[in-house]
Amino acid sequence: MYKFSLILFLLSSIAFGQENENDTIIITKTYSQRWELNDADKNGTFRLMSYKPIYITAGRISSYPNKQPKSENPDYSATESSPYNNVEAKFQLSFKTKVVQDLLWGKGDIWIGYTQKAHWQIYNSDISRAFREINYEPEIIFRYPVKMKVFNGEFKSIGFAFNHQSNGRDLPLSRSWNRIIFHIGYEIDNWNITLNPWIRSSDSDDENPNITKYIGNGEINVSYNYN
């Protein structure tokens, strides 16, 4: 299935977090500032901040929309097709807040993150302009600052997160999974590089068999900081 996004307008262009798919963001803070790794950047706890990109696209075109979702687990395969349009809107909201500061020798922090992505059939009056899919992604994140110079740059942090993703649907359209995501942050000049490998948590009632074959076992995010 070939997809591309046409961004007609942005409610907000945010320079935080990771890049997803083909989203374009402008980085205004360094990796260290976004995660408050240095003492000078500490802002305390329970301050709501942007996390991943926040955006809205008025037009997203899919050549072959998934009208009848299927799974390798037969209990999670739709039995009927839905009359989805090829064009829909899409938006994402994402925030984080620090809940514990200065753990483990006064340096580690615990954050709570939440991301919600919606695919909206706003142009489809036949189904009352319903949401085709809404994905919810809460996570608990631990970050610990490090300073290790390598290749004229510096490793800035290590950490991990407990991540849950779900579409909040009932059978047979329910999709959810859990994983542990590891974080390694590196800065060189104005470039920020984050390596995020993950391990999937076992699930006795597997809704997504072999999901890592489709989305992989990690991601690398590269961003540039405009001074």
Predicted regions and their residues:
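Sec-dependent N-terminal signal peptides
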Residues: 2-13
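Generic detector of intrinsically disordered, low-complexity, polar/charged segments
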Residues: 12-14, 41, 56, 182
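Outer-membrane beta-barrel initiation region
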Residues: 19-124, 135-138
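Outer-membrane pore/translocation modules
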Residues: 68-78, 85, 100-224
